[in-house]
Amino acid sequence: RQMCIRDSGKPAKITVNTYTGKQGVVNIEREVDLSGSTHSKGVYILSGYLGELFAQDIPLCLTASICFEQLYNGVDGDSASSTELYGLLSSLSEIPIKQSIAVTGSVNQKGQIQPIGGVNEKIEGYFQICKMRGLDGSHGVMIPVQNVENLQLNDDVVEAVKNNLFHIYAVSTIDEGIEVLTGVPAGKKDKDGKFPAGTVNYLAYEKLKKYAKICEK
């Protein structure tokens, strides 16, 4: 599971399940008519990313369900697409994600993080919730690096960041983001197209290899 921040500044919990199948990435919100077209497009992009990264020598034999938990008034926009992809990678690799860090940011098929709107409101909204519950130095927000120039945060947030009670992580790729969220290297392919053992991408690929073998039976 992973936390994203909605346009209102309120966090929303996203859960992801992955298992053997051929349906690809299933957007539960879309299945029940709670997903806008922009959000649905963002979910389709995730399959493109997974296919290019992991399915060069094996078929992408995967079913994955993505759900905004306890959200019943609809979802639109693509600012949660990177969050959904982190959830997919976490589920496939079985490496847990830090639940104290909220995420916002769009992603393209190449894994590049793209800017979003309302970055200040999103950070300040999540900060207020963390402050009410008690800041302990583990809380923070991950944003697209392009949005750094848009930051005009209130004094409370700035002071908390200075005192290492709250953190803002600016990332440009999915690989950078998953390392912040898990504390584990993402893993780059070597010249033979293999991921380093123990990395997030290695473990995700190994899981997908198992799925592919099951689908062959």
Q: Which residues are covered by each model-predicted region?
A:
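Peripheral, non-AAA+ core regions of ATP-driven protein-machinery
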Residues: 12-34, 38-217
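Short, small-residue-biased leader/transition segments that mark boundaries at the very start
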Residues: 1-5
